[in-house]
Amino acid sequence: VLALLPSPEVAPHSSLSRMAGFAVERWGRPRSRFLADPDAGVDGPSVREALDEAREEAAPVLLLGTAFAWVHWLEWAEAQQYRARLPEGSRLMETGGFKGRSREIPRDELYRRLQETLGLPRHRMVNEYGMTELLSQMYEPVLVAPEAGDEGQRDDRAPTPAQGAALSGSRAHRAPPWLGIRVLDPETLEPLPPGQVGLLSFMDLANVASVSAVLTEDLGRLDSEGGLHLQGRAPGAEPRGCSLALEEMLEAQS
C-alpha cells in the first residue's frame, strides 16, 4: 500500500489518513508507506523508488491519494520523463474532488495522465466519495462490474467493447446497504425522484456514536438503479474536501 498522504501520526485529525492507516494495517506489506507530509509535500523521488521496487518484485500495488496529490506527483514525474509499468493486479484510488481554489483538473485529463505515467488501465482506477461526517464511503464499482459479465472485470485484461460500455456506466458511485441516500430539493428539502439533481442527504447507520443524518451542500442525482452521480457543490457553498487540504499544503511549499 502506497499512500500519497501524510501518515495518521503526522495528521491525526485527517479522516482520510486514518482510513489509509487502516488499509496499511490490514493489507500492507513491510514496504507500505506514506509519501507526503505537511513540510515537504508529496515526495516525488520516494514515490518513484517505491514504484520501482514494486515492479522489480512483481508485487501488486494499492495506490491511495487525493486528486491534487496525484496532479502534484504527475507534474514531477512528467518533468523527469518517468514512466512506470505497475505489476498486474495493481489498483489506484483517488478522492477529494477535482475543483480546487486555484484551478480545476478535468477528471479525464487526470486519468489519461495517470494511465500514461503508471501504465495502469482506467478500469483499475476507482474514485471514492466520502466525508469525515460519515463512517461509510461510496465507491465506483469498476473493479468488479456485474454488467461486464458473470465474473465481472476481475483482472487487468482490457475490457471488450461491450464490457467497456458497461464499465463506463458503472462509474456511478454505489453505497453499502446500511447507508441511505436521498436527493432533496434545495429550496423545500423535499425528496426528488431519480434523475433530478438536488442536495445530497445521507443516513449512515454506521454512525453509532455520532449523528446518523447528514445534509450536505454537495449536488447529485440518483439513477433508476440507485447509483449516485455527483454534480459538484451547490452554488455559493464553501469549497471543502481532502483535495483542498492537500492543495493548501502543497501551495504552502511553493
What is the role of each PLM region?
Residues 7, 13, 21-254:
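Active-site glycine/GP-rich loop and adjacent strand/helix microenvironment
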